[in-house]
Amino acid sequence: MPLDARIRARPALSHRAEENRNMHHEADVVVVGAGIFGCAVAWALGNQGRSVILLEKSLKEPDRIVGELLQPGGVTALEKLGLRECLDDIDAIKVYGYDVIYYGEEVRIPYPENATDTVQEINEKQSHSDEYRGTKRKRPEGRSFHHGRFIQRLRQKAMSNPNVTTIEATATELVRCGFTGHVLGVEATRNGEQESYFGNVTIIADGYASKFRKESRTDTPVVKSKFWGLELIDADLPMPNHGHVLLGEGSPVLLYQIGTHETRALVDIPENTPTASVKAGGVKGHLKNVVLPSLPKQVQPSFQAAIDRDRLRSMPNSWLPPTTNKTPGLILLGDAMNMRHPLTGGGMTVAFNDAVLLSELLSPEIVPDLDDTKLVLQQMRKFHWRRKGLTSVINILAQALYSLFAADDYQLKALQLGCFRYFKLGGNCIDGPVGLLAGIIRQPFVLFYHFFSVALYAIWIYITSASLFGMPIRAITSIGVFWKACVVIFPYIFSELQS
């Protein structure tokens, strides 16, 4: 049965199940973290008749500078979950695509048309070559908003589910079977008291700074830069209802409206950036002396006002490849399990699609009893590989684009220019890449095709832009440009395959 049909026919559990959650702290599923993924998966499993305990250390509205742009692929997943209304009444802004500005030169990149068609419908309408390139026809929309407002709407929706009990408590450690190591639930602190919560499955979704990640994997997130955020008031954006990516000397700057009067500015600052050192005036000095002059003239007044008014806040830009959940009784998901650079705004799209897929694979029709650990682990292996059609694309694209957009050598600069000129070609040269970024096109080969199309186009520009006498030298050094392209993308491809 389709997920949305199961939502309409949601079975309510007995009063006894609710009593078990409230009095005995026992449920089919314990979810740790009422964030993007935690709320979505609690809602989805509750709609299937599962008894769910949702734990969150603080139910106050969060105040973060990321998680504010939902791509069209995420909006579609939200609709499948029956959570589309969470985008209402939060002053969310429609997003139609991107505006990329390269040293003052501008190109509009709208979301691709016909994004809601199925693969079968696309095959019927397109040639085989067009399908490989990812060409589509009917333009969808994303949404941008204040993160905290959206989270509170998700939490309200989860709390309204009769099969979900939401408790404000801080999970402190896993509860394991002393003989098998099977995870039985979590210990948590609530109102200063230690309590235990038990479930056949414990889902950990406690975010990028997860305290439980080490329970199922030994590697840690790789952080090479931070996003520093400002909130601009009544900013005059070059292209309203679009995300703006500003490229120039140094790392990229993002601008996107999150409310009627508010615009988020995110400035990427790599570690050990000299212009952001204490001697150079710190981060505020970098923003004033390096970033501000590079912005479009119309944005500069609101950016300057935000620097003078706001406290500076940052978030680490992390890379953490996915892993298969192999611990009996434990499922690690959300940012706790997989992260990519937030440049492409793909995190929430991944989370909502993971919630859809997980609820399908663990549905009562397939897994009648979540206490069947062997079957649950079998389904989690399927989950790991089935999610890659979308998540591997978003993961690899985010890391590869950041490498190009934060170019710091001549090879990457050549690829960066090639990427921008490729977008300027229009047509499929923008529909394919932005379809991948939007979570609409779920074909890794399309990513591979466009990335190396960019690389070859960049090499052609690199060679032909030289003088007649310089072309032979450029032809030789272009080998380094192609090699750099391989160095950029293949490590992330291998990490997806190995994981």
Regions found by a protein language model. Give the residues of each.
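FAD/FMN-dependent oxidoreductases across multiple families
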Residues: 6-11, 275-384
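Glycine-rich FAD pyrophosphate-binding loop
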Residues: 32, 46-66
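Generic enzyme active-site microenvironment
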Residues: 54-55, 204, 333
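N-terminal Rossmann-fold NAD(P) dinucleotide-binding loop
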Residues: 38-39
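C-terminal helical "tail/cap" subdomain of flavin- and related membrane-associated enzymes
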Residues: 6-8, 360-499
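Conserved FAD-binding catalytic core of PHBH/FMO-like flavoproteins
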Residues: 173, 181, 187-326
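Extreme N-terminal leader/targeting segments of oxidoreductases
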Residues: 1-29, 44-48
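Conserved N-terminal helical subregion
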Residues: 24-26, 76, 87, 93-215, ...
